A protein has these predicted regions:
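N-terminal intrinsically disordered, low-complexity segments enriched in P/E/S/T
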Residues: 2-3, 26-169
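Sec-dependent signal peptide hydrophobic core
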Residues: 12-16
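C-terminal segment of classical bacterial N-terminal signal peptides
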Residues: 17-24
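Intrinsically disordered, low-complexity segments enriched in polar/charged small residues
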Residues: 10-11, 24
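N-terminal export leaders
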Residues: 5-9
């Protein structure tokens, strides 16, 4: 028995829905990029940039410190790779970092901060992943309690949270 127009359209709609779901399912299998480094870099893993997944950041040597911050009432423990290790992985060659947050807030910091201080690209706070609503998933944190110089607006303003990219100039 031949298909009616109605049955034919229903079949086409079902096939279209199934075909549309295939790329979405494949995209779920690909690890999510949480940080992009671009600009003056010598290493890339995507056209013109170096993309990090959370697993890639976790595979770098991890460092922790506990410090007071202006954003929390109690000292917090921050854990993640050193900023200098992230920059080295991307072959950073510039002198200035423009850290860009998910809401497009931008903070500028010298690349040298990563060598002068053990700045952490925190992915954990108090040993737990940081949700976006609490400054995650990534947060540039200086060890404020380790040096009086770091307890100033200059360094607090360089501490971008909800970090999504580093643009190197």
């Amino acid at each position: 028995m031949p298909l009616s127009r109605r049955d034919l359209f229903a079949c086409l709609a079902a096939c279209t829905t199934l075909l549309a779901a295939v790329p979405a399912a494949q995209a779920q299998d690909k690890p999510k990029v949480v940080l992009t480094v671009s600009g003056k870099i010598s290493k890339t893993n995507a056209p013109g940039k170096f993309e990090f997944t959370m697993d890639m950041l976790a595979a770098l040597p991890q460092h922790s410190f506990t410090t007071m911050t202006p954003w929390y009432k109690e000292p917090r423990k921050f854990t993640g790779p050193l900023l200098r290790d992230v920059l080295a992985a991307a072959g950073v060659q510039g002198k200035l970092i423009k850290a860009v947050a998910l809401n497009d807030y931008k903070a500028e910091l010298p690349v040298d901060d990563g060598t002068k201080f053990p700045v952490v690209l925190a992915r954990l706070m108090d040993d737990k992943p940081m949700p976006v609503r609490d400054k995650g998933p990534l947060f540039i944190v200086y060890p404020y309690d380790s040096d009086e110089v770091l307890r100033s607006e200059r360094y607090y303003n360089r501490s971008a949270w909800q970090l999504k990219s580093l643009e190197i100039e």
